[in-house]
């Protein structure tokens, strides 16, 4: 989403997982820290992009946003790695799909496509997707962990972020 929207600067809470600040560094995005006590999700800066990596609640999608979910091993639907972006913007969904899939459309052999956008090889393998479908009923019937701000360290005191 940050690449798709060509975001130049973001802010994130002091207490969060390290992946968003690392991604900002990787993409050359200016990073600012903010004091925020958040629960379940937070907006990334002044964007409509939401870090919802620990959110697990029925009908929780916020319209006109990009909600980034995580299936990392400590999450409620644990697949080891990977995630999903929820959006109701069909054009953006197609662009993001192409970005995740080497810049190509998934249903046409790549050699037959005139690839017009860069891709990043971030797609979920069919095997991981199948595992997710197998685990989904149990995840839906199990109460999720309620993460709190204390579950996250203050990243600003880590050497890498000084």
Q: How would you describe each model-predicted region?
A:
Residues 1-2, 71:
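Generic hydrophobic alpha-helical segments
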Residues 56-58, 66-162:
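Active-site region of PLP-dependent enzymes
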Residues 3-59:
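PLP-dependent aminotransferase-like
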Residues 46, 65-66:
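Short, conserved active-site loop motifs that form the nucleotide-linked donor/cofactor pocket
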Residues 62:
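Nucleotide-sugar donor-binding and catalytic loop/hinge architecture
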């Amino acid at each position: 989403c940050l690449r798709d929207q060509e975001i130049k600067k973001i802010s994130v809470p002091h207490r969060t997982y390290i992946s968003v600040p690392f991604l900002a560094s990787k993409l050359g995005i200016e990073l600012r820290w903010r004091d925020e006590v958040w629960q379940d999700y937070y907006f990334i800066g002044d964007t409509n992009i939401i870090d919802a990596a620990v959110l697990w609640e029925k009908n929780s999608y916020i319209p006109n946003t990009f909600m980034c979910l995580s299936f990392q091993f400590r999450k409620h639907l644990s697949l080891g790695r990977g995630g999903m972006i929820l959006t109701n913007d069909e054009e953006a969904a197609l662009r993001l799909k192409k970005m995740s899939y080497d810049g190509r459309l998934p249903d046409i052999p790549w050699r037959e496509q005139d690839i017009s956008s860069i891709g990043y090889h971030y797609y979920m393998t069919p095997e991981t997707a199948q595992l997710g479908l197998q685990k989904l009923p149990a995840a839906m019937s199990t109460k999720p962990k309620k993460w709190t701000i204390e579950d996250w360290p203050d990243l600003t005191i880590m050497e890498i972020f000084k």
